């Protein structure tokens, strides 16, 4: 994923953290995806072992939830308001970030083609 797009993903997480609702951690994110209670999922690429998140892309695709990867769990944790790294974040309510989410979803879909 291009750096410019990664920055937009972090920005969306920050906006949702401040004006909407985000949930953090792979277990919490998995539950929300299974229930269809999230609009966007972000996963860190530097998670060890990678099997921790291996199921999430499939679940997201089954439920038609947009997802993206970012390189750093530390930066993802920071963007979501934590002082610790986090493997995954679910945006439950984007708050004022709706236009950014729509733009990101379009760009991510283009990348997958």
For each predicted feature, which ranges?
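A short linear-motif detector with a strong N-terminal bias
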Residues: 1-2, 20-21, 47, 66-71
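Short charge-dense sequence patches
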Residues: 3-11, 50-59
């Amino acid at each position: 994923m291009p750096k410019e797009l990664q920055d937009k993903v972090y920005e969306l997480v920050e906006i949702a953290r401040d004006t909407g609702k985000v949930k953090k951690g792979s277990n919490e994110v998995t539950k929300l995806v299974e229930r269809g209670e999230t609009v966007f999922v972000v996963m860190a690429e530097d998670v060890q072992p990678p099997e921790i998140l291996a199921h999430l892309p499939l679940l997201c695709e089954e439920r038609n939830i947009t997802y993206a990867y970012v390189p750093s769990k530390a930066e993802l944790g920071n963007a979501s308001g934590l002082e610790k790294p986090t493997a995954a974040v679910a945006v439950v309510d984007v708050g004022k970030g709706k236009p950014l989410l729509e733009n990101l979803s379009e760009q991510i879909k283009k990348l997958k083609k």
